[in-house]
Amino acid sequence: MISPQEKQDKVIRATDLDALSCRYSANNKSYFSKPDPFIDSLISSYKMHLPLCTGYTNMSANRTLRSVFNEQKLPLINRGTYLRTESIDVITQEFIKEFKKCQVISLGGGSDTRCFRILEEHGEDVRYCEIDFHESVKIKKLAIINDKKLADIVKYDEESQSITSKEEFARLESNIHTENYHLIGYDLRELTGALDSGAILEYVDTSLPTLILSECVLCYLNPKENERIIEFWKNAFASKALLALLIYEPMSLNDAFGTTMTHNLSNRGINLLTFNEYPNLEARYKFLSEKCQSSNVKLTDMSNVGGYDSDNTTKAWINSKDLARINRLELVDEIEEIRLLLKHYCLCYCEFSHSPSLKTINKWKWILE
């Protein structure tokens, strides 16, 4: 029997499977201009090792995996996944292009494959750190060490491992540390602003311009934990290199659609603790600029990113050629429906430092800045 906290953590970890299945679907439908060759390795590791995780049996793990990967995703979900992935990718690539030698820290990196794409292209210049729950990290570690291509990309040269029991899985060291890649098992809720989390900072280079990514991660923490985690990173980089934060997550907008989202998530045992606390772009701007004391704050909803609220010719997030391409992939009948859905997801960027800002952050159209 698992504890209530373990049960809640299991629910949160399961959202990583949701995200992976959405990327898998969008990839299979050819939404990404460059197909993602790394997704299958993560899925294989999940299929092999999810039964070994806390709260799962072979039967329940297989049922969960069938549920998420056999489900046909709606076109609006595939399009939303594309816009989410593409918008974060373009900002990350611009950050790397502008600063050359830099660092990316992914909070709740889980099954995300962005690290492999970036290190494959920029491995000599970019230091990449991923932090997530221990069990999520172990599944990713096993994907890496049992796939030569992934191991070569992150420069991991130890032998592959076969883990077949819960006992072996529990004993497995979760972390990977190579020259430019660090995979760290850590509960982000344990971070404090006091810089007492040496397990993290030991592998972070605070002299490098750094972009922190949070994709649907901070939304599972309460507002105080949000402040504490941001304060931790702010203190770590105080008076040093540029620290930038990029957040993607849902917001309620205090409307009927937001209420429906809340009920649907609640039925799955998911409580988005910032969903109603910061219900719109204005509330999030105030949180980042006033409570967190960040600068160069910029926010948009994903409807704007997808070009549903503008002519998409000035400072467009997605160029007209790519928009035309994805419009041909699947028919989306209800434009108003996808616009409404995308209105409830936001992209937030801000900086902490007196160092030079990311100049090219202004190349895209933001709603609030």
Curated annotation (Swiss-Prot):
Gene Ontology molecular-function annotations: protein C-terminal leucine carboxyl O-methyltransferase activity
User: What is catalyzed by this enzyme?
Assistant: [phosphatase 2A protein]-C-terminal L-leucine + S-adenosyl-L-methionine = [phosphatase 2A protein]-C-terminal L-leucine methyl ester + S-adenosyl-L-homocysteine
* This enzyme's EC code(s): 2.1.1.233
Give me the residues that bind S-adenosyl-L-methionine, please. Answer: R84, G108, D132, D187, L188, E215
Q: Name one GO biological process term.
A: methylation
Membrane recorded as keyword: no
Q: What is the top-level taxon of the source organism?
A: Eukaryota
Going by the UniProt record, its keywords in alphabetical order are: Methyltransferase, S-adenosyl-L-methionine, Transferase
What does this protein do, in the record's words?
Methylates the carboxyl group of the C-terminal leucine residue of protein phosphatase 2A catalytic subunits to form alpha-leucine ester residues.
Family according to the record: Belongs to the methyltransferase superfamily. LCMT family.
Name the PANTHER family for this protein. LEUCINE CARBOXYL METHYLTRANSFERASE, LEUCINE CARBOXYL METHYLTRANSFERASE 1
Protein name (database record): Leucine carboxyl methyltransferase 1
- Per the UniProt record, the source organism is Debaryomyces hansenii (strain ATCC 36239 / CBS 767 / BCRC 21394 / JCM 1990 / NBRC 0083 / IGC 2968)
Q: What is the lineage of its organism?
A: Eukaryota, Fungi, Dikarya, Ascomycota, Saccharomycotina
